[in-house]
Amino acid sequence: MDGANLRSQPVLEVRDLWKEYPVGDETVVALQNVTLNIMRGEICCIFGPSGSGKSTLLNQLSGLEKPTRGEVLIGGIPISRLSEEQLTNFRQRHLGFVFQSYNLLPQLTATENVALPLMFRGVPKPQREQAARELLARVGLSHRLNHFPSQMSGGQQQRVGIARAFITRPDIVFADEPTGNLDSKTTTQVMDMICSFARDFHQTVILVSHDPEMASYAHHIVTLRDGGIVGEQRTQHIEKERGFHASNIHSQQVLLFDPYYPQSCRYTGS
């Protein structure tokens, strides 16, 4: 099945999602009336300024927190109705995570960190470490297989994190500000790797960012402000549309500026 057909099938559905937190005698509304579909094989960027509700939404979508009301369905399964044990098993089998702070275990080598999700699935050590070595080679770290996180740069640690997230071929990979601690050159390298894995493995990726540059890597851009969706755009061919996206909330357009691509390759919304 090609990418266009894959992206006609929703893998994640959000229905009238609300998240509220009690603060003293008051209630803070962090998310309100969020409804959206994210398609299989799609790269979706949840974009907005600090405090807009991006990370809160990511926590709801990934089952790390339960909504106050509304539903999140992954593959048709309403994850907020699962018990904590069921939810833990579901995340291990169906979800992958890339973190801004890498979240590698310091006492494990690069190979062992990448192989960890397969260990939780009961894959024998020789097979899981072979799979880890293959993915580390793909992200350019064949020379770091036995290095510990403290012996690697931030960009190298994030590449280990990417390999770990994709090793189980999960239904969805969640990436929370995956380049927030990286310089611009390393950011490009890391995002190119994420897009390459997503394309080749037909994976769904949901990334959170406050940086408009990140939207240039997405098929689907969801703009948040004050806990609600204020803009949503879709396109089909991100490999031709690398550039700088700036969300114009009032006109609901996406503007791209990139001197390296002709105007015909730039998505301008509709």
Give the predicted meaning of each segment.
Residues 214, 230, 238-239:
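Flexible, glycine-rich phosphate/dinucleotide-binding loops
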Residues 4, 25, 76, 155, ...:
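Intrinsically disordered, low-complexity regions
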Residues 81, 234-235:
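Short amphipathic beta-strand/extended segments with alternating polar/hydrophobic composition
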Residues 10-224:
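ABC family nucleotide-binding domain
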Residues 221-233:
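H-loop (His-switch) and adjacent beta-strand-loop-beta switch element
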Residues 1-20, 235-270:
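ABC-family P-loop ATPase nucleotide-binding domain
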